[in-house]
A protein has these predicted regions:
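Peripheral, non-AAA+ core regions of ATP-driven protein-machinery
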Residues: 1-234, 239-240
């Protein structure tokens, strides 16, 4: 029986909080469970993480694997915890050293082939990490340019779970698909996809556009509410900053 740990960061709106992830590998029938108030996309991380680790040359334990997300009282959303879950399982199974992730945050969504995909909300995550005195963050390679906006935090980019294993001193057997390089090349210098359009393309929505213009010009906070399909995402994607 062994326990592996890793740190991640959760978001509720723009409020960030540290998530401690512990993986427990124990005797029993093969089963992988995630507890600690995960949402649907995070619960589905079981299949993503297992497949991604196997694609990195890691032999998944033929035993019971339990992953706990703490604090249990806080809801955890999204797929940005995938890589940290993988790291905790790898640590529990002895594929990487137990102490190599101490004081390091791990972020990233993983694909079934082991590639690490970019995440959203990196800036508030990094600012919170800096406030908590955490100096190192392992993140998707495609997010590195965005990470440079926050000084005093060391950002380490990985493109594959296998690179994380090697970074932590373990042995990995993997190949980064060519499609990954093509996608990363299209992302551009900022590590983010360009805006899909211009505000001038939006018909109507005069009050909403005026509010966005005022917020962008003055650097003010802005919250948009309303039912799905009313144009919140469309307007936000066309707002600079």
């Amino acid at each position: 029986m062994a326990i592996g740990s890793a740190l991640s960061v959760g978001l509720i709106g723009l409020k960030a909080f540290i998530v401690q992830i512990q993986a427990f590998v124990s005797p029993g029938l093969p089963y992988f469970s995630i507890i600690g108030l995960p949402d649907t996309s995070l619960s589905e991380a079981r299949e993503r993480v297992k497949s991604a680790c196997q694609a990195s040359g890691f032999k998944w334990p033929e035993t019971r694997v339990t992953v706990n997300l703490s604090p249990a009282s806080m809801p955890k959303k999204g797929s940005s915890h995938d890589l940290a879950i993988a790291a905790s399982v790898l640590s529990a199974a002895g594929a990487i050293a137990h102490d190599c992730l101490a004081g390091t945050i791990v972020l990233g969504e993983v694909n079934l082939d082991g590639t690490v995909l970019p995440i959203n909300g990196l800036l508030p995550i990094m600012l919170h990490a800096r406030e908590q005195g955490i100096a190192t963050i392992i993140m998707p390679y495609a997010n590195l340019d965005e990470a440079r906006l926050v000084p005093d935090v060391k950002a380490i980019g990985v493109r594959h779970v296998g690179e994380l294993i090697e970074l932590m001193g373990g042995d990995a057997d993997y190949r980064i698909p060519e499609a990954t390089h093509a996608v990363n090349a299209d992302v551009g210098a900022t590590g983010m996809c360009p805006p899909p359009g211009d505000m001038s393309e939006v018909m109507g929505q005069h009050a909403a556009k005026w509010a966005l213009e005022v917020a962008a010009a003055g650097g003010h906070h802005l919250m948009m509410t309303g039912p799905p399909g009313t144009g919140k995402t469309m307007l936000a994607s066309r707002t600079p900053g």
